[in-house]
Amino acid sequence: MIVVLFLLLPPVPEATWEWPTEGAHRVVRDFRAPTSPWGPGHRGLDLAAEGPHLLAPTHGTVSFSGEVAGKGVLTLRTPEGLLISFEPVEALVEQGEQVAKGQIIGRVLPGHCPQACIHIGLREKGLYRSPRRELGVLQRSVLLPLEDYALG
C-alpha cells in the first residue's frame, strides 16, 4: 500500500529559473518565514557563489538598482509580477532595463556570509516566500515509520 502511495506522488518540480551564481548549486542558509510582518526571519536564500558573476535567473525588468542600508541591491520584476531581489551586489544593469535569462546582471560582493554568497529574496503579491521551487532545490517529502517518534 505504501509503495502504491509513493508511486502516486507528483514528481519534484524541475527548476523554472537558472541558478544565479557560478559553481556548485548550494544553499548556504535557508528561508525562514517571520512569525509576524515585521518579525525576525530570513526572507530568502543565501546561495554559494564560486565566481564573481550574478546571472539573471529568468527574464524580466530591473525595477531597482541601488543601495539599501549600505548594501548594493538589485531587484528584477518578472512578467508574472514576481520581485526577485539580490544582495550584496554591484549592479551591471540599470533600472528599467530588460534582462534575459542567464545574462550577467551584476558582481557578487563580500559582506553577507563568511564565504562568498548572494542573498536572493522572492516576493509574490507583497509577501516573501522561498524561491526553492523556481530554483529546483525542493526536496521530496519522506514518510517515516510512526514508531520512530514519540507522540505528544
Annotate the PLM regions.
Residues 73-76, 99-120:
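Short hydrophobic beta/alpha edge segments that flank linear recognition/processing sites
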Residues 119-127:
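A short hydrophobic beta-strand segment most commonly corresponding to one strand
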Residues 51-54, 89-97:
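Short, surface-exposed secondary-structure edge patches
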Residues 48, 77-79, 123:
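A generic structural motif
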Residues 57-92, 116-119:
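Zn2+-dependent peptidoglycan hydrolase active-site motif and core
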Residues 2-73, 100-101, 129-133, 137-152:
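Surface-exposed, glycine-biased beta-strand/turn segments
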